[in-house]
From Swiss-Prot:
Activity control summary: Na(+) is not transported, but it plays an essential structural role and its presence is essential for fluoride channel function.
GO CC term (a single one): plasma membrane
Membrane topology: Multi-pass membrane protein
Transmembrane segments: 19-39, 42-62, 89-109
Protein name in UniProt: Fluoride-specific ion channel FluC 4
Function noted in UniProt: Fluoride-specific ion channel. Important for reducing fluoride concentration in the cell, thus reducing its toxicity.
GO MF assignments: fluoride channel activity; metal ion binding
Catalytic activity: fluoride(in) = fluoride(out)
Keywords for this protein: Cell inner membrane, Cell membrane, Ion channel, Ion transport, Membrane, Metal-binding, Sodium, Transmembrane, Transmembrane helix, Transport
Pfam family, one: CRCB
PANTHER family named among the record's database cross-references: FLUORIDE EXPORT PROTEIN 1-RELATED
Binding-site residues for Na(+), renumbered to this chain: 61, 64
Similarity annotation: Belongs to the fluoride channel Fluc/FEX (TC 1.A.43) family.
Amino acid sequence: MRFFLSGYVGRRIGETFPWGTFVVNVSGAFVIGTAAGLGARLGGIFSTTIFHEFIMVGLLGGYTTVSSFCLQSVNLMLDGEQRQALFNIVASALLCVLAVAAGYGGIMWIMEWPG
């Protein structure tokens, strides 16, 4: 899944910057935040060790890719693209944290709706 989405985004937006990895990591962070919110709000299966280890660490951790992000940042620096490398590092870290918070907060907000 990561390979196909990353490749698709790269072909659509361009490959002079690692947009594919960027999109994969931010979307994965959002889904991990959503899963954590489900565990905190609903409990049950969503708060079990197996859910945490298999879904969050295994599947979603395997979907996102810190190693590719790091290598691409170093390659940008080696290619003389220090600004793009810095943007990649700062924007990835910031947006991934915000995406986790948005996923988590979104679940908390939705689950408080009267219904």
